[in-house]
């Protein structure tokens, strides 16, 4: 979401709007309220201000990289015990950056971290800034309390020191005065006693008063000096405390501002170099302090005051002890040339003291960050922290997705997805493709949100292109489809209009392809589509109705409304296309146009004279009667429709028919619906794409361009497109290839996913059905529409016992690969208007493959139907040949029971089966064991003769039983 005002920008940065207004005013951007507009320039000025306040500089820093290489040899024994000398080369690389002079301002004195540290700490800086702000808040509170205590203690200490100093000076003055008095006394002793006594008596009071006056003056001066020093110390301590509080406040504000700046920079695409704020450091050992105070070649030393101000803030406040006074930096200096400071790792200089806890919240942890992590490198950028709560992800699930990709989207292992699917009762592998519904169930099962979406679908660009086209709409010719039942004269009617003879050259006198022609009439151009009338070409007729503007429904006057006539009416009504009825064959004596009208009214097509909206025109394709009236009505309907299409725009159309020509390659008949198709255009048709190399009209003549409603044949596609596919002209062949490959993969993945989902169901169906005969077929046709119609017609022949299995169907001639496939699958090859080449014929003869050629769809369907009938199991029927009555029963040793019988009806044969009836109830069914007349075995006994009969495995024969004699015959079945 683009932030247009201060309030929106503050919500985006997750900070109060008032704080943002203060920062904007500090940056020189005058914004008074939250509703003020905010431009990109204002944001840039705010970012520059924040960077400068954090110490970022624009100047390039000079740096030098030094590499040291050291080679040594070591000897090591291998597995055989033999000593080997190994060359070991150690390379060390250090980068030194020249910093600014130490005497510059505080922003220039701050140490800029190296690029590697900045990149590593950029990701965790926001969390660290928050922790540092909380820590600084605590430290500020405790610092204020400690500072007050320090001020009081410092004032008392200095007062005591001043008082002691004044007392010492006063004692020295008294001692000096005493020594002077003693010297004078010694000099006076040499004089006369009288005079000395007199002088002593006179000078003693004066001397005492002088000493008292000098002592009082010295005390007053000492008190004034002590008070002045105490006042200076208190003022200095207060200034220092205020400076430290101001520094803490600035650092807290800087940390918060830096966190906001980091959030903004993480959202921007370009990489912004932000100078990192130096985090507070714990107290350091003397060696590290000396190195820091002096500085190295690439790290300047800090001033003593700054180091002393930074140390109390980083020390743990719970200790309660006052901070030690900062010693002068010059007392603990270390020369750069001594030791290993030039090649030593920076982390050695940042080694902290041992503490019971980390007061910095993990901000300052380096190579040896804590007491238990000594010697271990824990890089915070690469260390993993387990989430405290489960992460719910939004998973975009395409139409098909593999198990591995689905697991990757959820950031889990593929084995977890496989486990869940096993619990759901489906065994999958890591590379198996799942359909969208199954994948979404798995995502929900694992606790994530599943969204059905098409990510990176290149076809979305096509929709955007359609919306953006605003070319001028111009009138276009109408597209008229001729539909009707087979043999009702559709092609003959078009032949008369076009003055051509297409019908005479068609196999069997029927149309088996969809044809496209355009005819110039005195009133304009009309494009005709001729569709087949056979029931097998339903899909072809549906495509014709989809691409048309007007339908001419041809009905034979002597035949009336037939099944395909009704189907054509339903296609036209489904497409919302007006119908013009042509009642053909009115020249025949048995023609009855009135009956045709009544039948069409029953189907919902009402003529104009009956109050409907469908013109009925009686015509004769043989004599030409009524043809002009038919064209007049068609053009009248076209004027009412006001057909328009853009001309000066990329072409769009539909594939009417497609085929594979041996010399030309894939050829597609395209009806242009809008725009202009030119030679050299890049076209996309379904999964096929390519550049138009050649373009022919319906007469086979080359043409350079085709406008709306004009049918043309184009060459140059990558493969044979599907009939009915939409044709689009694209400006870029790379984009066309991308969309075509995407469609191919999508079609293949969806097909595989559906096959996988239906495996279990089909397995159960086959188990329930038992043994089913399969007739494998390979179908090669001349055009896509014929191949589609033939496949659908043959699949309809399948029954519960015999099933047609289409192993492969395609457009083009029969090749060696087709014969090899037929050999492997034991299939029969059917060529519809195609032939096999020489190599394929030789291979088929060698392998015994049956190749059948047809040019009429009836013949192909009938022969396949006959072959399937031969595969059916024969039907067994029982035929009763005679009836026998038992007159007497004989018990014969070693033979069994023999019945003396009379043949009452028909004939009894030795090979017949017998059914025993007792009281008209069947009690046994079996075979004859013997058939005798007197003592001779006979083959048959006719009606009216007596015979003796014995049955296999049945001796319970009673007088009065009847034997029904029958034979089982097998009858061939048909579909």
UniProtKB/Swiss-Prot annotation:
Region of interest (G1), ranges: 484-491
GO molecular function: GTP binding; GTPase activity; guanosine tetraphosphate binding; translation initiation factor activity
Compositionally biased intervals (Low complexity): 104-115, 178-211, 302-330
UniProt region (Disordered), positions on chain: 48-84, 96-388
CDD domains given in the database record: IF2_eIF5B, IF2_mtIF2_II, mtIF2_IVc
Listed InterPro entries: DNA-bd_dom_put_sf, EF-G-like_DII, EFTu-like_2, IF2_assoc_dom_bac, IF2_II, IF2_N, P-loop_NTPase, Small_GTP-bd
Annotated region (G4), positions in chain: 584-587
GO CC annotations, alphabetized: cytosol
Domain tr-type G: 475-644
Region ranges (G3): 530-533
Residue numbers spanned by region G2: 509-513
Keywords of this entry: Cytoplasm, GTP-binding, Initiation factor, Nucleotide-binding, Protein biosynthesis
Subcellular localization(s) per the UniProt record: Cytoplasm
Region named G5: 620-622
Superkingdom in the source lineage: Bacteria
Biased composition (Gly residues): 359-372
Residue stretches of biased makeup (Basic and acidic residues): 48-63, 120-177, 212-263
Binding site for GTP: 484-491, 530-534, 584-587
SUPFAM superfamilies on file: Initiation factor IF2/eIF5b, domain 3 (SSF52156), P-loop containing nucleoside triphosphate hydrolases (SSF52540), Putative DNA-binding domain (SSF46955), Translation proteins (SSF50447)
Function: One of the essential components for the initiation of protein synthesis. Protects formylmethionyl-tRNA from spontaneous hydrolysis and promotes its binding to the 30S ribosomal subunits. Also involved in the hydrolysis of GTP during the formation of the 70S ribosomal complex.
Assigned protein family: Belongs to the TRAFAC class translation factor GTPase superfamily. Classic translation factor GTPase family. IF-2 subfamily.
UniProt xrefs under PANTHER family: TR-TYPE G DOMAIN-CONTAINING PROTEIN (PTHR43381:SF5), TRANSLATION INITIATION FACTOR IF-2-RELATED (PTHR43381)
Name this polypeptide is given: Translation initiation factor IF-2
Organism: Burkholderia pseudomallei (strain K96243)
């Amino acid at each position: 979401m683009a932030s247009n005002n201060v309030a929106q920008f503050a919500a985006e940065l997750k900070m109060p709007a008032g704080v943002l207004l203060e920062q904007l005013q500090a940056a020189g951007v005058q914004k008074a309220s939250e509703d003020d507009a905010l431009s990109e320039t204002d944001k840039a000025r705010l970012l520059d201000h924040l960077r400068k306040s954090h110490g970022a500089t624009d100047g390039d820093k000079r740096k030098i990289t030094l590499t040291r290489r050291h080679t040594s040899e070591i000897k090591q024994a291998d597995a055989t015990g033999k000593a080997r000398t190994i060359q070991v080369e150690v390379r060390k690389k250090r980068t030194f950056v020249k910093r600014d002079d130490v005497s510059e301002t505080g922003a220039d004195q701050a140490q800029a971290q190296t690029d590697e540290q900045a990149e590593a700490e950029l990701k965790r800086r926001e969390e660290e800034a928050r922790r540092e702000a909380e820590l600084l808040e605590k430290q500020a509170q405790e610092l204020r309390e400690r500072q007050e205590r320090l001020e009081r203690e410092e004032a008392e200490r200095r007062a005591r020191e001043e008082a002691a100093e004044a007392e010492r000076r006063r004692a020295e003055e008294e001692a000096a005065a005493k020594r002077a008095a003693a010297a004078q006394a010694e000099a006076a002793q040499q004089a006369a006693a009288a005079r000395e006594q007199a002088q002593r008596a006179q000078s003693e009071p004066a001397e005492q008063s002088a000493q008292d006056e000098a002592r009082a003056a010295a005390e007053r001066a000492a008190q004034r000096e002590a008070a002045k020093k105490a006042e200076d110390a208190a003022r200095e301590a207060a200034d220092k405390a205020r400076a430290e509080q101001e520094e803490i406040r600035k650092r807290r504000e800087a940390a918060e501002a830096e966190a906001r700046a980091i959030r903004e920079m993480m959202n921007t695409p370009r990489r912004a170099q932000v100078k990192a704020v130096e985090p507070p450091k714990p107290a350091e050992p003397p060696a590290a302090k000396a190195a820091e105070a002096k500085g190295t070649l690439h790290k300047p030393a800090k001033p003593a005051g700054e180091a002393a101000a930074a140390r109390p803030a980083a020390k743990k406040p719970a200790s309660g002890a006052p901070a030690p006074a900062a010693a002068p930096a010059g007392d603990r200096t270390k020369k750069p040339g001594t030791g290993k400071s030039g090649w030593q790792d920076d982390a050695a200089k940042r080694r902290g003291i041992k503490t019971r806890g980390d007061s910095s919240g993990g901000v300052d942890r380096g190579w040896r960050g804590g007491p238990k992590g000594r010697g271990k490198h824990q890089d915070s950028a690469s260390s993993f922290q387990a989430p405290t709560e489960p992460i719910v992800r939004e998973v975009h699930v395409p139409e098909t997705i593999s198990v591995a990709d689905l697991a990757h989207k959820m950031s889990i292992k593929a084995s977890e997805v496989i486990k869940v699917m096993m619990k759901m009762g489906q065994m999958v592998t890591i590379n198996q493709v799942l359909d969208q519904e199954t994948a979404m169930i798995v995502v929900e099962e694992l606790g994530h949100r599943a969204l059905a979406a098409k990510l990176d679908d290149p076809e979305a660009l096509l929709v955007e292109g359609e919306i953006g086209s605003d070319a001028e709409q111009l009138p276009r010719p109408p597209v008229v489809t001729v539909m009707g039942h087979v043999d009702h004269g559709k092609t003959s009617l078009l032949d008369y209009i076009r003055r051509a003879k297409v019908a005479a050259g068609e196999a069997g006198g029927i149309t088996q392809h969809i044809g496209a022609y355009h005819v110039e009439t005195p009133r304009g151009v009309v494009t005709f589509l001729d569709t087949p009338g056979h029931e097998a070409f339903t899909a072809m007729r549906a495509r014709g109705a989809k691409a048309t503007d007007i339908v001419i429904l041809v009905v034979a006057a002597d035949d009336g409304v037939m099944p395909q006539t009704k189907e054509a009416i339903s296609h036209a009504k489904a497409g919302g296309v007006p119908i013009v009825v042509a009642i053909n064959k009115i020249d025949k004596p048995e023609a009855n146009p009135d009956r045709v009208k009544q039948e069409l009214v029953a189907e919902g097509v009402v003529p104009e004279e009956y109050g409907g909206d469908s013109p009925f025109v009686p015509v004769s394709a043989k004599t030409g009667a009524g043809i002009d009236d038919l064209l007049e009505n068609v053009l009248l309907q076209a004027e009412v429709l006001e057909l328009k299409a853009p001309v000066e725009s990329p072409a769009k159309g539909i594939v009417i028919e497609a085929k594979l020509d041996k010399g030309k390659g894939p050829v597609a008949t395209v009806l242009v619906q809008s725009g202009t198709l030119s030679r050299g255009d890049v076209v996309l048709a379904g999964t096929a794409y390519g550049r138009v190399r050649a373009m022919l009209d319906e007469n086979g003549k080359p043409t350079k361009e085709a406008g709306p409603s004009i049918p043309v044949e184009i060459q140059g596609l990558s493969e044979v497109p599907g009939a009915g596919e939409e044709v689009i002209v694209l400006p870029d062949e790379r984009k066309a290839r991308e969309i075509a490959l995407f469609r191919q993969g999508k079609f293949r993945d969806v097909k595989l996913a559906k096959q996988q989902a239906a495996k279990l169901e089909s397995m159960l169906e086959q188990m329930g059905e038992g043994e089913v005969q399969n007739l494998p077929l390979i179908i090669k046709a001349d055009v896509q529409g014929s191949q589609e119609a033939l496949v659908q017609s043959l699949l309809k022949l399948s029954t519960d016992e015999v099933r047609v299995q289409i192993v492969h169907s395609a457009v083009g001639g029969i090749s060696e690969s087709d014969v090899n496939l037929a050999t492997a699958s034991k299939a029969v090859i059917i060529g519809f208007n195609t032939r096999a080449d020489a190599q394929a014929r030789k291979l088929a003869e060698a392998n015994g493959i049956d190749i059948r050629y047809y040019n009429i769809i009836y013949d192909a369907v009938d022969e396949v139907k006959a072959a399937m009938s031969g595969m059916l199991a024969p039907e067994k029927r029982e035929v009763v040949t005679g009836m026998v009555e038992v007159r007497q029963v004989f018990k014969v040793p070693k033979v069994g029971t023999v019945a003396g019988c009379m043949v009452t009806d028909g004939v009894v044969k030795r090979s017949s089966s017998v059914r025993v009836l007792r009281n008209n109830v069947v009690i046994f069914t079996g075979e004859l064991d013997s058939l005798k007349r007197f003592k001779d075995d006979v083959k048959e006994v006719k009606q009216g003769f007596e015979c003796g009969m014995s049955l296999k495995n049945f001796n319970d024969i009673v007088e009065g039983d009847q034997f029904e004699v029958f034979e089982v015959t097998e009858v061939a079945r048909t579909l």
